Each structure stands twice: as structure tokens, then as C-alpha cells.
Amino acid sequence: MLYIINTNSTDGRYHETHHYDCEHRPSSQHQEKLGEYNFDYIAMIFAKSKYQDADGCKFCMPTEHHG
């Protein structure tokens, strides 16, 4: 599964991580590819290494959504 992160913080608080095919992903100019991972939690480890405030999308990554 390919993951992307929103380079703009959502609500000024979180950089949301999404599956590439998520209907709620940001527009292409605000996407940064994180890479391909087998599990959401592994993608979040990488996302948090880039953006400490990274959070999972409540729609495509509900187990990683905490904000």
C-alpha cells in the first residue's frame, strides 16, 4: 500500500497520513509520498519521523487516527 502525507497541517495541528487512494487525501500540491508499507502502523512510524505531529486519516487509517 502506498502512503502519502499532507504537507499542510490539518486544523493547524496535524499532518494527516493517508492511503494513496483515499477519497479524503489532500490535493496533489500538498502531498508528499511516504512510500509503500504493509501495515498502517509502520507507515505511521515513518510519517512521525518526518512530521512529529503526524496522525492517521480517520477514514482510511482509523486505527492510527488520534486527533
Predicted region positions:
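Short aromatic-glycine-(Arg/Gly/Cys) micro-motifs in beta-strand/loop hairpins
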Residues: 4-31, 62-67
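Short, mixed-charge low-complexity intrinsically disordered segments
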Residues: 32-67
